[in-house]
A protein has these predicted regions:
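Conserved, single-site charged/polar hotspot
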Residues: 1-410
């Protein structure tokens, strides 16, 4: 990839920004089915698609519900014709089928998303493996981003907030393409879930696509390298650094005060979890029958809980890391009351790791907290409020990140 330095975000020598804050392969060609074709034409492919310099990204598509990378079958519509593939399909006898969708894209009807059925542009690779079918969508990075922005931020948000989101998403994607964590095992750069960035869950709108186009190629770098541009929904009043995941925090991620989203429903919340629920989780975790106590034993500099001690009749076990703690304290099926008094049913994770708890053995655990998401990087709700107050997308990024430059990815 190539970059050139545009503007510097932050003030060198003045402590930087008060910050804290979510490659492609060679073109394999495009194949389109015609009315006279029994099957869609297969795009040429080869080892050259493993290049990381083409400006294309390879996305591993998960199944409905985002439970697995493997599909038992795939049904799709290409140029008005319907096709179905299974591991026994003759077209997959060589192990791989590559389809090109053209301008209309490929509609995969066997995958359910929030807005179904999803449409994918570029090429679709169907790989036959012993575990099932792998689906990899290879497409231009900018086209990919048009599927990420509306899936990660409401299209109703202000234009400048959407543009800041587009730059974060682009930077994050380029960073993942360089790291290649899925390349060796799956031949992909990212998947389409919250494991990386949600892609293709909600269809693009003119407004979200415009945000991508108006920031075309812009990424955030430090020392000439793309940063990992994390983002999340709503802060508790302060952002975190990536130290909440262990290790030393990155220099471009600093904890900052964040009052822009202080009136958001998720800025504070409370939930009660029955003691018996946590006792069952403790039993699954440790094998012990009795849960004696739960207490916070460690917090990050920003106030996020990073250590939770669970004491049983046999031992004391400490959970470390915000994700593990939020998972153990999952309010699944419980009622969460938000700041404005509205209620929602809890999911598989505690809304955030910014919380306090009051444990009553044999009764319940009362948890009061603030924020939604991991808290690292840019608060999307705050970004929208900043945009309403007249902040530009560059100024929004300046607030959440430190000592970075805006460079252009090509």
């Amino acid at each position: 990839w190539k970059t050139w330095t545009g503007c510097v975000l932050g003030i060198a020598g003045a402590g930087g920004i008060e910050s804290g804050m979510a490659v492609g392969m060679q073109n394999t060609g495009s194949a389109e089915a015609t009315e006279n074709d029994d099957l869609p034409e297969i795009a040429e492919s080869g080892d050259e698609r493993l290049s990381t310099l083409s400006g294309k990204i390879r996305v591993l598509l998960m199944d409905s519900g985002y439970q697995s990378y493997y599909h038992s079958s795939v049904t799709l519509n290409l140029n008005g014709a319907d096709y179905e593939y299974t591991p026994d399909s003759p077209e997959l006898s060589q192990g791989e089928l590559v389809l090109g969708g053209g301008e209309a894209g490929i509609t995969i009807t066997s995958i359910e998303r929030q807005e179904s059925p999803p449409v994918y542009y570029g090429t679709l690779e169907i790989q036959n493996t012993p575990q099932g079918l792998l689906l990899i969508n290879e497409l231009p990075l900018e086209t990919y981003l048009e599927g990420v922005v509306p899936s990660e931020m409401p299209a109703s948000y202000e234009g400048q907030a959407l543009m800041a989101q587009a730059v974060c998403a682009r930077t994050y994607a380029v960073c993942q393409m360089e790291e290649g964590s899925l390349q060796e095992e799956y031949g992909a750069d990212v998947d389409d879930s919250v494991n990386f960035q949600v892609y293709g869950n909600i269809a693009p709108t003119d407004k979200t696509s415009q945000a991508v186009r108006e920031t075309s190629g812009q990424i955030m770098c430090q020392d000439g390298k793309p940063v990992t541009a994390y983002y999340f929904s709503t802060s508790s009043g302060r952002t975190s650094t990536d130290e909440i995941w262990g290790g030393t925090s990155s220099s471009y991620l600093k904890s900052v005060e964040c009052e822009f989203d202080q009136n958001a429903p998720w800025s504070s919340w409370k939930v009660t979890i029955p003691w018996t629920v946590l006792e069952e989780r403790t039993r699954n975790l440790t094998g012990s029958e009795s849960l004696e106590s739960i207490q916070v034993v460690k917090k990050s500099e920003s106030g996020a809980v990073t250590g939770l001690q669970i004491t049983t009749e046999k031992e004391a076990v400490q959970l470390e890391g915000e994700y593990e703690i939020r998972e153990f304290l999952s309010p699944q099926g419980q009622t969460i009351t938000e700041k404005d008094g509205s209620t929602v049913t809890g999911g598989s994770l505690l809304p955030s790791s910014y919380f306090q708890l009051k444990a009553n053995k044999g009764g319940c655990v009362e948890i009061t907290g603030g924020g939604f998401g991991h808290g690292v990087g840019m608060s999307q709700t705050a970004a929208n409020e900043m945009a309403k107050e007249g902040y530009s997308w560059q100024e929004i990024l300046e607030y959440f990140f430190r000592d970075i430059t805006l460079d252009r990815y090509e």
